[in-house]
C-alpha cells in the first residue's frame, strides 16, 4: 500500500475524488494517484496526489486533458486540489449519471468513462442505500 494512503484517503473522506464512489463499500482500498502524472512532470507532493477508485484511475491513466463533448478539444481534466467538485459536476439521483457542468467536468466525465453501464448500476444502488452523496 502507498505510504501516503492514510493521509490522502482521510483528506478525500474515503471517496474517489473524481466520481465520488464511496470507498467503504469496496473490498479493496482505493488508489493514490498522481493528478499530474510523473511522466508529465508531476511531483510526489501532497498537492499532486488524489484518491481514485480503480475505474477512474485506469481510465485517467496519464491523461491531463480530455475532449469536452460540446466540441471543445484539449480541455484540462478536473484537479481535486485546485477545483471544486460541485462546481464542475452534478449527479442525477434518479439515473445515477455524473454530468459535467463545465467544460472541465464534461471532459473529465468522458475521459474517465464515469457513466459506463456497470458504474451507473452501482451508483444507483449506492444512492438507494444512502452511501452516495
Predicted regions span which residues?
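Histidine-centered catalytic micro-motifs used for acid/base chemistry in nuclease
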Residues: 31-37, 53
Amino acid at each position: 500500500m502507498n505510504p501516503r494512503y492514510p493521509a490522502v484517503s482521510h483528506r478525500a473522506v474515503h471517496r474517489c475524488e473524481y466520481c465520488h464512489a464511496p470507498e467503504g463499500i469496496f473490498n479493496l482500498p482505493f488508489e493514490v494517484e498522481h493528478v499530474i502524472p510523473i511522466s508529465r512532470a508531476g511531483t510526489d507532493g501532497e498537492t499532486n496526489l488524489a484518491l481514485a477508485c480503480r475505474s477512474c484511475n485506469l481510465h485517467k491513466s496519464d491523461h491531463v486533458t480530455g475532449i469536452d463533448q460540446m466540441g471543445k478539444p484539449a480541455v484540462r481534466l478536473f484537479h481535486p486540489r485546485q477545483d471544486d467538485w460541485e462546481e464542475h459536476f452534478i449527479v442525477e439521483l434518479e439515473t445515477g449519471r455524473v454530468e459535467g457542468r463545465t467544460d472541465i467536468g464534461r471532459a473529465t466525465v468522458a475521459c474517465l468513462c464515469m457513466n459506463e453501464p456497470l458504474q451507473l448500476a452501482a451508483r444507483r444502488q449506492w444512492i438507494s442505500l444512502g452511501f452516495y452523496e
